[in-house]
Amino acid sequence: MDMIKTEGLTKVYEGVKAVDSLSFTVGKGEVFGFIGPNGAGKTTTIGMMVGLIEPSAGKCLVKDVDVTRNPMEAKRITGYLPDGVGFYSVLTAKQNLKYFSKFYEMKDSDADKRISWLLQYVGLEKVEKPVGSYSRGMKQRLGLAQALLNDPEVIFLDEPTNGLDPQGVIQFRKIIKELAGNGKTIFFSSHILDEVRHVCSTIGIISGGKIIAQGSPDEVRRKMLKDSNVTITVKVPGSMPKLEDSRIVTAQYNGSSAVFTASEDIRGSLSEELFRKGVWVRELTLEEKTLEDIFLETLYGGA
């Protein structure tokens, strides 16, 4: 079942398309990683998906509810952790959550039980000081508790690990995996690939307001590798003969070995040619770029 579906989702500011015709789906229990550099359109997209920004064109459905036409119904089944979440600084975590529970028309007894459980879940049950004295990581954990307050089926997280220390990132990953394991659908944005690939079943890479690749991490890597060369190293017992193949881009020979860059994996062809020449292959290895390498080169022009 598709819990999130966008159809031609577009936002135009002063004639410039900040988000350009996004169409994708996210299934139940799926963790979708929405990745791209700052300014790519991630926050604007999420703003439209949670009903805070009106699309210029297209629509977003959350569990078949049109977010723009039925924002209150969509709010009932969604949770949202914005980048730079804000709270009342003079109130405690419990007091802040109790205030927000009013927006969901929760009974006091139900709200108290839910808040107590959530604070324990995010590790803030023993913190009684005002939120204004919280660290960045503590505020993010409280923000997650607020996003889960109404026990939503779909959760939107905008740069949730931004500014967290390594331990905080690990804690967030653990919670996200637990939520997905319990059937929650999670839409998770970040500008750092490593922060989402550990928990996401599907990723979408956005640049200039457009999704340039989408699928599982392996599928995205293969798709983005189509225009990228591979490196093949060949070693033989004696002298390395010259090898010919139209797909070879460069070749470097050094005694009993050679390193080729090629437009695709040609190990089979190289092995067959060496066999025809009566040369035994001692080593034949392929080196492909990692998803991180491709991501950095495509969006940032390299590391």
Question: What label would you give each PLM region?
Answer:
Residues 1-4, 301-303:
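Short, Lys/Arg-enriched, disordered terminal segments
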Residues 2-6, 11-207, 213:
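ABC transporter nucleotide-binding domains
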Residues 70, 107, 221-224, 266:
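Alpha-helix capping and helix-coil boundary motifs
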Residues 75, 97, 112, 170, ...:
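Generic structural signal for individual residues within well-ordered alpha-helical segments
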Residues 121, 175, 223, 269, ...:
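Solvent-exposed, charged/polar functional surfaces in cytosolic regulatory/catalytic domains
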Residues 173-261:
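ABC transporter nucleotide-binding domain
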Residues 226-303:
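Short, charged/small-residue-rich alpha-helical element at the C-terminal edge
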